[in-house]
Design a protein with these regions (language model features):
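Hydrophobic alpha-helical segments that form the core
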Residues: 37, 90-110, 122-134, 146-153
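Short secondary-structure transition hinges
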Residues: 45-88, 94-95
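Secondary-structure edge/capping motif, primarily at the C-terminal ends of alpha-helices
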Residues: 18-22, 48-52, 111-114
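C-terminal peripheral helix-coil segments that are non-catalytic and often amphipathic
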Residues: 73, 77-80, 84, 116-164
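An amphipathic alpha-helix adjacent to DNA-recognition modules
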Residues: 1-20, 31-35
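Active-site-adjacent scaffolding segments
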Residues: 17, 26-32, 36-39, 43, ...
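A short secondary-structure junction motif
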Residues: 11, 37-47, 82, 107
């Protein structure tokens, strides 16, 4: 499962898709990366069907390691770019670049912290407000809508799986 997910990420890396764009500032690149990631249906379907990570500590450790090695440096580069171009105003680029992948891959994972779609959306809003207060106003209405759709689809898939 990890190798398939890694290959899918490499083939359709939303960070690489925005890195070289000169028409976007750092903040806009992060928002666009989130939009691209949310629109990647194959990866989302795989996430919905992924094994419960709490039952396999190796999967959990591998996910945390991949976040640290892969996602954190991408977030750091984009946050620093935003600091330089003035679209982001934070003293915590490194800390935020480490925290965002942990929050989005663990805290928002219903297999780790069971939650309804409404509860996940509430958590997502909390993350958005926290990031905003830290000088990284990344969650806009469009991204909030994408997250809501994703959480509702996940909840529907879980309900369907429970009926089978």
């Amino acid at each position: 499962m990890d190798a398939v997910g890694d290959r899918m990420f490499e083939e359709n890396n939303p960070f690489e898709a925005v890195m070289g764009r000169d028409d976007l500032n750092g903040l806009e690149k992060i928002r666009e990366m989130i939009r691209l990631n949310q629109s990647d249906r194959d990866r989302q379907d795989m996430n919905i069907q992924s094994i419960p990570i709490l039952k396999n500590p190796r999967v959990l450790a591998g996910m945390i390691d991949a976040n640290r090695r892969v996602l954190t440096p991408y977030f750091y580069r984009l946050i620093e770019e935003g600091n330089r171009d003035g679209s982001i105003h934070t003293e915590y680029a490194r800390e935020l670049s480490e925290l965002i992948p942990i929050l989005t891959s663990l805290w928002l994972a219903p297999s780790v912290f069971p939650a309804s779609a409404e509860q996940m959306l509430h958590k997502f809003r909390f993350i958005g407000e926290m990031l905003d207060r830290m000088g990284l106003p990344v969650i806009d209405e469009e991204i909030l809508g994408l997250a809501e759709s994703h959480f509702r689809e996940f909840e529907a898939a879980e309900e369907k799986r429970a009926e089978e």
